[in-house]
Amino acid sequence: MARKLFTPITIKDMTLKNRIVMSPMCMYSSHEKDGKLTPFHMAHYISRAIGQVGLIIVEASAVNPQGRITDQDLGIWSDEHIEGFAKLTEQVKEQGSKIGIQLAHAGRKAELEGDIFAPSAIAFDEQSATPVEMSAEKVKETVQEFKQAAARAKEAGFDVIEIHAAHGYLIHEFLSPLSNHRTDEYGGSPENRYRFLREIIDEVKQVWDGPLFVRVSASDYTDKGLDIADHIGFAKWMKEQGVDLIDCSSGALVHADINVFPGYQVSFAEKIREQADMATGAVGMITDGSMAEEILQNGRADLIFIGRELLRDPFFARTAAKQLNTEIPAPVQYERGW
């Protein structure tokens, strides 16, 4: 039987050499606080391309300075960010990998000086600052910031854009009734709470014609929060809008007890794939080749997003291939040690 983990897949006009995706993970290493890449970021991402990851998604990159989680996050709110990202995309592609970027706004979870913004003036928790409720004008302005960031991503040479609509950040805050108490067109019904994301997708697609992913938190793990049924509905709308894949994570909107175990989020990817007829990515405690292969062989997801395991092992692709008794090509420079 062919090992599906190492079978190419084409999404829109992009072909990945395998189904392994480096999940976006914040490194909090833009130490000049200007949102720019550092030598660390270059080494971090290029090393995973050398390690034969099919698709590398750069960590959450803020569309606005006040949309960072911390002041050491990456940003793509300025044309000054394009040059650094262009150098990174060129180097990653030289190693045969594709590269994406996650466009993000932290919303009420921003830990920054000055005002932070959210759909409603509801703090994340008792230790967090209370955000300013966004005016309708501010909402429209933020939608345009996502569009402008997407245009910069295209200029920088990225292959994929992922919109971050998960983990309790701004878009997730609009989607969930726990954090969105608005009474205007952006609050109330599921259609209204989805409107912010709908407008972002529509605007991004005006300047971006490549593969478009959206990361979601498929469960809030708490009463009256979002659950998988809600996200199946959202996924159907995303498909209508031309989103190519949903990256299925969960949680982090509110503090909640989560039963974490290997592959604990895979069922979300499976259900969205089946019930919304949508390509999905599985993520969360997927740590070996056999687990990844099972998910793919059983049609539970289309891509495997690997996070912490790629921090521990930049050569996860090689490790997984050995676990599956298959061979993958080595970088020419590494052939004698592969």
Curated annotation (Swiss-Prot):
GO MF annotation list: FMN binding; NADP binding; NADPH dehydrogenase activity
Cross-referenced CDD domains: OYE_YqiM_FMN
Domain of life: Bacteria
Binding site for substrate: Y28, H164, A165, A166, H167
E.C. number: 1.6.99.1
Cofactor needs: FMN
Induction data: By toxic xenobiotic compounds (2,4,6-trinitrotoluene and nitroglycerin), and in response to oxidative stress (hydrogen peroxide and paraquat).
GO biological process, one term: response to toxic substance
Regulation: Inhibited by p-hydroxybenzaldehyde (pHBA) and p-nitrophenol (pNP).
Residues reported to bind FMN: S23, P24, M25, C26, A60, Q102, R215, G307, R308
Catalytic activity: A + NADPH + H(+) = AH2 + NADP(+)
Entry keywords, A to Z: Detoxification, Flavoprotein, FMN, NADP, Oxidoreductase, Stress response
Note: Forms a charge transfer complex with a variety of phenolic compounds.
Entry similarity comment: Belongs to the NADH:flavin oxidoreductase/NADH oxidase family. NamA subfamily.
Assembly and interaction partners: Homotetramer. Composed of a dimer of active dimers.
Biological function: Catalyzes the reduction of the double bond of an array of alpha,beta-unsaturated aldehydes and ketones. It also reduces the nitro group of nitroester and nitroaromatic compounds. It could have a role in detoxification processes.
HAMAP family referenced in this protein's UniProt entry, alphabetically: NamA
Protein name: NADPH dehydrogenase
Lineage of origin: Bacteria, Bacillati, Bacillota, Bacilli, Bacillales
